[in-house]
Amino acid sequence: MAFADLTTDYKGAKSAIFRLALATGIRTVITAGFYRFWMKTRMRRYYWSAIRPGGMPLEYVGRPTEKLLGFLTAVVFLAFYIGIVNLILMFFSYSLFDGNAPAYAVSVIGITPLIFFAQYRARRYVLARTRWRGIRFGLEPGVAGYVWRALLHWGLTLVTAGLYWPVKTYYLEKYRTDRTFYGDARMHQGGSWKMLIKPMMHLYLSVALLGGTGVLLAATEDPRYAPLIFLAVPWFFYGLAAWKAGSFRELTNTKTLGEARLKSSARNGRIVGIYAGGWAAMGGIFIAAAIGVSILFGIIFAATGFAVENIDEDGYLTTLGNLPAFVPILFGIITYFAIFIFWGVLKEVFITLPVAQHFAETTEIANPQALLGIRQRARDEFAEAEGFADALPLGDAF
């Protein structure tokens, strides 16, 4: 008997993620970043539990203490690398080239493999701590192969000024997916890199228009070409959203798990709307908050004797009226951290959650009866967790 395709429900709510992100963000700031490992764990558990293929939620069972210990381990290693290796590079740089620029260049190149190393290890940890229907996901060891492939594909992407991007995206995703397991079943990434050309076309064309406009303006000094910039820039941002939706859709539609396969109907227009509406809402909220704070402090300054006469000929304040001198400093600190916290909170509410919801609700599992024979896999202890990703830092991505 054939089963119907499994659809995915999404049970997340903006109000709940706002409260969670705000509470954990404040605690992270108060603890000077120490709470971030607990914040990440709680946020991830919320998102995972909201995604429910076939009505059954994903589970995230990672622990914050794992992340903390992994971070400390990574910091010790990176401190050695940055301290000792860079010292050696600086010595040879001054000895051979009479300057420090070569040392900085080699140092950046030297740390690049660690970034790819951290990305693969972080993905392995997240999958090892994710379960669905009680069965664990997993990623088999293969970090060395991923690092050299990432270096090769990213190098070709830079050499081709971004034209190679779809090829890079496909082959790196294929490497990761082909080593991903659900229980004892291996996933497979089908298709080819050619299927990603179409989602990339808006970016190709908008960048070509922007670059061509710049060349025309420089060569002719004719301002009549300038309006093309106002076409190219919005088109570029549309292309970014279209690439996110299109690449997810094409890659998902060619993923299989044994006889089961994934299907996605993610829509470009919906992702564009989420980003446009989300950034507009965030900008409007911050502008309104800035106006409100300005009015409030105008009232406070007026009540405490501040006047235009307190500003000298160079534009500096000579007195704050009856306000203590530490008040502006305290206000600046509070404002900085308030912006830091609320930017992250609003981004979760208006961008991250709606995008996750759309991708989840447009994803289905075809031929789900093939999943019935899948058995549990052994637990991957993986003591270092996401330490290198947090330390570099690459740990903000889900």
Which residue ranges define each predicted feature?
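Residue-level hotspots within the lipid-embedded alpha helices of multi-pass solute transporters
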Residues: 29, 108-113, 158, 162, ...
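Cytosolic/matrix-facing juxtamembrane and C-terminal tails of multi-pass cellular membrane proteins
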Residues: 250-286, 297, 306, 317-326, ...
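Membrane-helix interface segments in multi-pass membrane proteins
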Residues: 82-111, 210-237, 289-344
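Alpha-helical transmembrane segments and their membrane-interface junctions
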Residues: 77-91, 158-172, 204-220, 279-302, ...
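Long, contiguous internal "core" modules enriched in hydrophobic/ aromatic residues
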Residues: 98, 139-141, 145-154, 158-270, ...
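Transmembrane-helix bundle segments that line or gate the permeation/cavity pathway
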Residues: 2-17, 21-185, 200
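Juxtamembrane inter-helical linkers in multi-pass membrane proteins
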Residues: 47-61, 127-144, 174-196, 248-272, ...
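Juxtamembrane/interface segments at transmembrane-helix termini
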Residues: 38-46, 117-131, 164-178, 219, ...
